[in-house]
Amino acid sequence: MSIPETQKAIIFYESNGKLEHKDIPVPKPKPNELLINVKYSGVCHTDLHAWHGDWPLPTKLPLVGGHEGAGVVVGMGENVKGWKIGDYAGIKWLNGSCMACEYCELGNESNCPHADLSGYTHDGSFQEYATADAVQAAHIPQGTDLAEVAPILCAGITVYKALKSANLRAGHWAAISGAAGGLGSLAVQYAKAMGYRVLGIDGGPGKEELFTSLGGEVFIDFTKEKDIVSAVVKATNGGAHGIINVSVSEAAIEASTRYCRANGTVVLVGLPAGAKCSSDVFNHVVKSISIVGSYVGNRADTREALDFFARGLVKSPIKVVGLSSLPEIYEKMEKGQIAGRYVVDTSK
């Protein structure tokens, strides 16, 4: 298979710098890496943070962002096992980990102190060819629609793991804060497929229609409802058993601690820059609620999340545009104008 020397990519050279669509060299895989011809990449809110550089963790610069890349293996290092040329492969947020520390030993690779992050510390999937650690790269079944599966590689895995972290049972209420966004639209479907009753909170044109089309049961529009807490408690007859906070609103996170049912779980997923999670201690203790953080997922979570997709239980509500349109997508994202998930075609 012929591999070119150069490729098209979106790259920036400083935080908040110009997003340049230009030719850059095709990377060479290290002994433990795959070289993947990225066909499509999802666009995540994390990519926006990587560009802004507003998280405590510094990015590499210059940087090619993106961490939801779906494509075809076209090359590999000499130490790679379990892959062959032509396999479908996915690039995840966790590009690689040491596999030797206590966290990796327990399957918590995302907490590895030496984790390498796609589109953050490792050039990501907003390019035609990208490298990924062969151990952490996702195995995608042949014949899968690579555009539709792309968002599963971060958004899908992330919300699936978060729902597992909520310790819910069939028939329990799962509240999704930010239910019509890229992560939320997938969380609604995973929750439904796992047997939960789903309440969604979001606001803006088309959000309720999308939520309902995905199988959600109760929708609360925060732009119209004056008392979100009371509305959730009433709709769920006592509060949600589990809340998945994919919204990037500090106020929404605080509210979720108040509409959580007694003995319920608040799961923090979205990462608004500089935000804090505030919970009234008396209410927290007397209601015996748990607040947990959930950060992407491990290889088993990846396999399980992809299986839901492969069986048709979860679909990606996507809009495909060219990679060159990435600056416009970021602008829409900053204005909260995105329903579902944008996916970029790296060839355009």
From Swiss-Prot:
Residue numbers bearing the Phosphothreonine modification: 223
EC code: 1.1.1.1
Positions contributing to NAD(+) binding: 45-46, 49, 181-183, 202, 207, 222, 269, 294, 296, 341
Swiss-Prot/TrEMBL induction comment: Repressed by glucose and expressed during anaerobic fermentation.
GO terms for MF: alcohol dehydrogenase (NAD+) activity; butanol dehydrogenase (NAD+) activity; ethanol dehydrogenase (NAD+) activity; zinc ion binding
Keyword hit for Repeat: no
Gene Ontology, cellular component aspect: cytoplasm
Sites of N-acetylserine modification: 2
Gene Ontology BP annotations: amino acid catabolic process to alcohol via Ehrlich pathway; ethanol metabolic process
Cross-link (Glycyl lysine isopeptide (Lys-Gly) (interchain with G-Cter in ubiquitin)): 226, 234, 287, 319
Binding locations of Zn(2+) 1: 44, 67-68, 154
Entries under Pfam families matching the protein: ADH_N, ADH_zinc_N
Keyword vocabulary terms for this entry: Acetylation, Cytoplasm, Isopeptide bond, Metal-binding, NAD, Oxidoreductase, Phosphoprotein, Ubl conjugation, Zinc
Cofactor binding note from Swiss-Prot or TrEMBL: Binds 2 Zn(2+) ions per subunit.
Binding positions (Zn(2+) 2): 98, 101, 104, 112
Cofactor needs: Zn(2+)
Localisation: Cytoplasm
PROSITE patterns reported for this sequence: ADH_ZINC (PS00059)
InterPro entries membership: ADH-like_C (IPR013149), ADH-like_N (IPR013154), ADH_Zn_CS (IPR002328), GroES-like_sf (IPR011032), NAD(P)-bd_dom_sf (IPR036291), PKS_ER (IPR020843)
SS bonds (residue pairs): none
Catalytically driven reaction(s): a primary alcohol + NAD(+) = an aldehyde + NADH + H(+); a secondary alcohol + NAD(+) = a ketone + NADH + H(+); ethanol + NAD(+) = acetaldehyde + NADH + H(+); butan-1-ol + NAD(+) = butanal + NADH + H(+)
Function of the protein: Preferentially oxidative, glucose-repressed isozyme that catalyzes the conversion of ethanol to acetaldehyde. Main enzyme involved in ethanol consumption. Acts on a variety of primary unbranched aliphatic alcohols. Also produces ethanol from glucose, albeit less than ADH1.
Subunit structure: Homotetramer.
Family membership noted in the UniProt record: Belongs to the zinc-containing alcohol dehydrogenase family.
Extra remark: Present with 1620 molecules/cell in log phase SD medium.
Annotated protein name in UniProt: Alcohol dehydrogenase 2
Lineage: Eukaryota, Fungi, Dikarya, Ascomycota, Saccharomycotina
